[in-house]
Amino acid sequence: MNAFKQKMHWKKYNRELADRGSLTVYLGDDLASKWASNNGAAADRGRPEVYPDHVLLLGLVLQQVYRLPLRQTVGLMRSVLKLSGVALPVPDSSTLSRRRRHLVLPHWPKSGRCVVIDSTGLQIRGPNTWLTTVHGRKRRTHRKIHLGVDPDPSLIVAGLVTPCQTHDSEAFDPLLATAELPAGHEVIGDGAYDRRCCYAYASKRRLRLVTPPRSRAVIHLQPDLTDRNRAIRAVRSLGTPEWKRTQHYARRSLAEAAMHRLKAAFGAGLRSRLWPNQQKEALLRAHILNSWNTPKRIPSD
């Protein structure tokens, strides 16, 4: 007897693909009041700020989602407001670039009982591209973004941007400092985090670090290395594959999946040239990914 073969509903399939490109713009009734909520309030020094931070954040989010330069982002914001029948001023590209470094991004969501950490590189555009063309790959440079991912809802709960020379173990402490991790939390990472400094920080915060020990790892009697000694004994008796299975080490692939989604959605390079702006740009992408995983309801008319 032939196996049942499901028939493809091509009409529905084509409609769903078309819906992926649909655009919904919702403008609240209080948009005009929030757009200029500062009302020209004077800052600490210099000229008063005209636009509040959330207006600039809106423009920068549009820039990242649609991969636009800042000037084209300004044109997009003007067009959306014009088509919606709303007459509001739009910040220019210089304002977006200048105030980006001072923006306060939203807090990271709270994690459950486990967080998976990893890092990836983001290329830098600008003068380095010309230097790479002339002098070869030795002049190529990038920035590293370190992320902590909660495996259950696939949300990014920690983020940090460092220069390319920073080792993953050196970013372990400041990365976890950006997350709200309770005592007893489990942190999963690759072999790059098999360092005494990482275990010392995990022991200080009463966290459990799960990382495969090196092939020639030896047991040390320091109290901070208790989890590492336990992992070494388990690997010697069970073997590395069985130890990974008992520790559910395969969850580490979720961090790699988050890196792939980050680059697939926003590209593998950074548009900003200044270091503070590069940090904000990379972390803003992570926050946008979180917003896509936690959609909000739009009130209907």
Locate each region found by the language model.
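Short capping/connector residues at structural and topological boundaries
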Residues: 15-18, 22, 28, 32, ...
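Polybasic low-complexity intrinsically disordered regions
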Residues: 40-71, 75-79, 86-215, 219-220, ...
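C-terminal extensions of enzymes
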Residues: 266-301
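Pocket-edge structural micro-motifs
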Residues: 27, 117-119, 291
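Helix-centered, glycine/charged polyanion-binding patches within enzymatic domains
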Residues: 1-6, 191-264, 272-276
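General structural signal for alpha-helix termini and helix-helix connectors
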Residues: 79-83, 268-271
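Charged, often Cys/His-bearing segments associated with DNA-binding zinc-finger transcription factors
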Residues: 1-45, 58, 87, 98-111, ...
